[in-house]
């Protein structure tokens, strides 16, 4: 089938016409409707995807894959989906990932306690279920429980004390929450229970580096010198930066990007080059056209209505476990997939602005992570909203999964609530939380309706403010596939 072949090759747009023709000829074929739903989902057209899956479900209500797909697209579109996930669980009872999706749907419908209870019940039945422990830890952290958020792991380890994967996940959750001091005794317990393991050595090296224990961290990283793993490479680069070993940092970063020109080393290499006075940083980030500032006020829905829509989906009480938010909340899921009119209008305005920005970028530069040859189509690796309140901010961070990243301001504190002239401003090119004494490359004042676009490899954060609300939309533009 031409449509299925196109889908397998990643050519979803080319698949729409043949699938539509096939549906016209065979409107009672549930699999065709399912395939149409998957294609529209990949194209981020969730309204059409939901319609296609609804038709597939009517034609074949007891098919497990159709039921699961239908539940997923309803959830992603921002529609009630818990009942659909209930059906999917009944049809595929062994698939515990559906249970986690059902829990997420319950949270989206305001039933956080029910979601926690559901995961807890399954963990009682299956105490070694790692994904369940991780999900529960994230839920408890976002609910504000930063002390006991990991308690379910202890219950799991009572049942499976020598499960190395469970110990690794336990340690990793502490690292995600930047609870490095608490991670160290868990690492020692893990070694005592299951023996030496590379993951425990990496976790200890990372924790001691982040805690500023540079002598111990240095010994550990030297013992791990032959490890070739992208995540480990980033930990090592952070250590070298914190330790002030700039020549080693530059050499390691250059070696890493030579292996993978879209890898995670660029943000650290930029800082190293700037601190060393190496003007290659200008090739990487110095061109002013890489950053764009756009006023979308006329293209967006009324900002008050958009702000109300966004506030309604900020359901957590606290910052997420493994994100840059401090003193605020972040929405779950892919914001731009939702089908509310305000969100669809928002997405359209953003796509047009990104297209304008990409069109004015300089020509391709060999090896450059942003200035690549093929720059379309525009798609999104993720999209979300952040709501910061008094004292809230983003610590300096980067987005390794993106090509272009962003900040779109929807609501801001009144000027009378700002403690300093630059309170809440966006900073680009600064990594102060890593002990780096470098000024930002650029600072940008937030204004309602203002969109800022910048390379995903560029460090960015925000200055804190004392009071009021800062409501933003953020997204990562997906890096277009390049010709092989």
Where are these regions (language model features)?
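Catalytic core of non-heme Fe(II) oxygenases with the double-stranded beta-helix
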Residues: 341-351, 355-453, 458-464, 468-484
